[in-house]
């Protein structure tokens, strides 16, 4: 509770930055009472990305992350939607899933499903991947997006093997303590025992009809412990996927290009996204 109260105070101080770029129409809309930032190219494009910024389900997107979203939009040529989804400081995780689904549905009025990608970092990676089991969970009137990229997707530990791997990686990880992934389940439930299992242990989700998916992990992060379980899930459901691992790299390294290898991760992320949207580099 002390952790959550600390995050509530930090989130209360957080502000949506005032972005300016002559190539974009930048605006906001509201979905379920939450702001969604729209970064729309003035030169019309039919390609878009739903950009889900992580924060352990308890921290709102920081101004620096929003500026990275604009850089991503600029470098990929995609229109980008950034939802400030409900956090588990105040709601169970079901609320975030519902709001993100509603945001995606709103995008379908402007873009074809196959022209929409979903990129998520950390807990945002969980939410990006989680759109698939959510659609399969009685929302099958919604078409799947065209492509998913999950960077260091967060999920809770489901097996002893995952926990053993995570404890080993904990010795190297500078960002996500293994112990947090033990306590995260209660944070995500927020007192609601009806939160579906797949929202907490995403590796158990139903990935039927999942679009092509790219995973990107750093080899030295605790969340990499769950990569084999995600691979097994992808194989079980016949998903076209790729697993990219940055050797010696840290949590969400492509979006924190603080060294040469991490900068290469950012460039790779941009190249892959453009390729999947059929945009020439």
Feature names for model-found ranges:
Residues 62, 68-69, 81-115, 259-262:
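Catalytic nucleophile-loop/oxyanion-hole region of alpha/beta-hydrolase
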Residues 118-120, 151:
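Short beta-strand immediately N-terminal to the catalytic nucleophile in serine-hydrolase-like folds
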Residues 46-55:
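Short beta-strand element of the alpha/beta-hydrolase
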Residues 56, 85-89, 155, 250:
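Alpha/beta-hydrolase active-site loop signature
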Residues 1-6, 47, 113, 130-281:
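Alpha/beta hydrolase fold serine-hydrolase catalytic domain that processes acyl esters and thioesters
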Residues 61-63, 92-93, 161, 226:
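Conserved catalytic-core motifs of eukaryotic protein kinase domains, centered on the activation segment
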Residues 1-44, 194, 281:
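A glycine/proline-hinged amphipathic helix-loop "lid/cap" segment
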Residues 120, 124, 128:
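Gly/Ala-rich beta-loop-alpha elbow adjacent to hydrolase catalytic centers
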């Amino acid at each position: 509770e002390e952790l959550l109260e600390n995050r509530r105070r930090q989130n209360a101080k957080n502000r949506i930055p005032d972005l300016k770029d002559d190539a974009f129409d930048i605006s906001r809309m509201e979905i379920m009472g939450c702001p969604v930032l729209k970064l729309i190219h003035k030169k019309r494009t039919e390609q878009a990305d739903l950009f889900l910024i992580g924060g352990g389900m308890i921290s709102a997107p920081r101004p620096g992350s929003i500026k990275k979203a604009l850089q991503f939009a600029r470098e990929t040529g995609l229109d980008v939607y950034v939802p400030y989804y409900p956090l588990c400081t105040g709601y169970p995780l079901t609320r975030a899933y519902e709001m993100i689904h509603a945001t995606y549905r709103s995008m379908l009025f402007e873009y074809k499903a196959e022209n929409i990608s979903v990129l998520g970092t950390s807990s945002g990676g969980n939410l990006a991947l989680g759109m698939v089991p959510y659609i399969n969970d009685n929302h099958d009137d919604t078409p799947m997006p065209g492509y998913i990229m999950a960077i260091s997707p967060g999920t809770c530990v489901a097996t002893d093997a995952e926990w053993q791997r995570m404890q080993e990686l904990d010795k190297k990880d500078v960002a996500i303590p293994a112990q947090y992934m033990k306590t995260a389940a209660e944070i995500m439930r927020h007192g609601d025992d009806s939160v579906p299992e797949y929202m907490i242990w995403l590796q158990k989700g139903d990935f039927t009809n999942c679009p092509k998916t790219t995973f990107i992990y750093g080899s030295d992060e605790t969340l990499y412990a769950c990569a084999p379980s995600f691979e097994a899930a992808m194989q079980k459901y016949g998903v076209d996927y790729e697993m990219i691992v940055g050797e010696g790299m840290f949590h969400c390294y492509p979006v924190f290009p603080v060294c040469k290898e991490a900068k290469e991760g950012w460039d790779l992320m941009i190249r892959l996204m453009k390729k999947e949207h059929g945009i020439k580099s």
